[in-house]
Amino acid sequence: SSRTIEKNCKRDINYMYLLEGRKAPDHAAIARFRSKHFAKCARHFMAQMTKFLIKLEQVTTTEVFIDGTKIESAANRYTFVWRKAVTKHQARFLQKTALLVGDIIQRQELKPLWQKQVKKKHVKKILKKLRAKANEESLEFVSGRGHIKTQLQRDIEALEAALEKLKEYEKKLHICADRGSYAKTDPDATFMHMKDDHMLNGQLKPAYNLQHAVNSGFIVAAGIFPNPTDVMTLKPFLNQMEDDLSFAFERIVCDAGYESEENLSFLRAKGIEAYIKPANYEQIGTKKFAKEIGRKENMRYDKEQDCYLCHNGKEIKRSGSRRVKTASGYIREETQYACSECGGCPYKEKCMSGKNWKKPLEERYKKLTVSRLFEELREEEYRRINSEEGKKLRMNRSIQAEGGFADIKGDSGFTRFLCKGNENVFAEYILYAMAHNLGWLHSRIQNDKLDLHLYELKEDETEAA
């Protein structure tokens, strides 16, 4: 914190050496510099440091390891605003407002200005007419004990209160944007599930999704996102990196949290080799997975007939196709398959087990939904990550990308932001990232590892992988 830095500048000989005899800065000056000056150019400084490390041949432009973590906001933990709750209360309040406006129109003998639903603009127009009427009648607004308000004054005050409430709902929804929640004391923070759940009740806390890219142990880029999951952060983060560094890395290595058809097709279109572990990679080799006969992965696919053969040898034929729009706006083409010979099948219970069925077992028929493009991209990923190079890159991702977070969160104790707002928390992390890079460069010099970019697989690790 800024107060700790101020105290160290006065008491720590290392800080005094860096000051070179100058007066120790005030904590307010440090905080002002961080939020008002450094925050505006933090991305530029991070990019310049990365370019300098490339010039020193400490960072390569071939591969980059990406990982994300959630860091708690400085906001109070119970200052939540939920988008669904606001939307529900807004709709309920609009119904009450419609009744209020209807009564006022009858009393004041005005013409209705809406057709189906009362909106904020209608309340404004009626309020304007009532104020004009009050001016014509030279109405004196009164308040307090011993004063009796006229009906016109009461109607005007009721509409003003309703208008303020509608504005409050609109403001909350505007702050939420496409998020599901925000914190009152830090509107840029979003409520997310955190790993450190001390209450063991799945408590949500205001936090930021922090993404960083690592190469040769150095943090080369970072980004702050409101998404609780990593899958929707990859595209904007890579675009941000390309804008800042003026080039794109040749290979991207991520964990299973980034796998989606949108991300894989995006990387293919940009000519970037993706080493992203499929989400079902750990399950697909287990005995339990192999025994689940209802999964399409355990069925034989006939490419010529475009159908699947189930465990009983029946054909699950193509029944149609559809276009599905995801939350990010990406349109996915899906092919639907259905079997018409499920009656009396001895494997029906195992094939169509599950709790989400609305029909009884006797009336069920096997259906499959498949994205051909995603299946093709996933097969490509399997080939890449199971190659010798893929195993090596996966090992380096766990060492380098997660190691960077281990150094900053574990060793430095950085688990909660001190600042508020996207720009300020990003600047705060960039300071940590730059400090990490300087410390890592010093460590490489001291240990004579300036040429180390990738760790090599050991023989036993190769066999295990």
Model-flagged regions — what are they?
Residues Y17:
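Extended, structured, electrostatic nucleic-acid-contact surfaces
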Residues S1-R11, E20-A465:
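Anion-binding and metal-coordination hotspots
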